A protein has these predicted regions:
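Peripheral, non-AAA+ core regions of ATP-driven protein-machinery
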Residues: 1-158
Length: 158
């Protein structure tokens, strides 16, 4: 179950949230504002008060807005195709933006999820694998990308 909270104060892009359960430093949350979800990161926790930095304009944000904490940290997505794109600091694809800025609450995929790559297996079916083990690789241009087991996974490779 995701932790919930409510905005209790706003100073520019620094927002204070009262939470109903513990959250972690650097955890990602989304603040609901008229059907748009503003991404923010926890920068300080003091008891049930959490200070978050909002990465977008807070114009229109009010005390009482609902906040949902995702239970994970700010992450980047790595994979083939990453070298052929331009990103901002949150890994939004700058080439797909309509204008100079993204619209509030709009997020782009950092990778082309429809692109197909030639996969060369490095693990064999039946191998026991754990986080960070190499499963295989794909080549982007001249650079091989290693495909690894995600950090929270372990098991038999099929």
């Amino acid at each position: 179950m995701k932790t919930k909270g409510k905005v209790v104060s706003i100073i520019a892009n620094l927002v204070t949230v009262q939470v109903d359960a513990p959250v972690a430093q650097n955890e990602i949350c989304y603040i609901e504002l008229g059907g748009v979800h503003l991404m923010a990161e926890v920068i300080k926790v003091i008891g049930d008060k959490v200070y978050v930095q909002v990465f977008e304009s807070t114009r229109g944000l009010t005390v009482g807005c609902e906040v949902t904490f995702e239970g994970h940290m700010l992450e980047v997505i790595l994979g083939p195709g990453i070298l052929s794109r331009n990103y901002d600091g949150l890994q939004h694809n700058l080439e797909t933006m309509d204008g100079v800025f993204l619209k509030r609450g709009e997020y782009t995929s950092p990778l082309d999820l429809k692109a197909q790559w030639n996969f060369k297996p490095l693990a064999n079916a039946g191998d026991h694998v754990r986080s960070a083990d190499w499963l295989g690789e794909v080549t982007e241009g001249w650079l091989p990308h290693k495909i690894m087991v995600p950090f929270a996974m372990e098991g038999t490779y099929v």
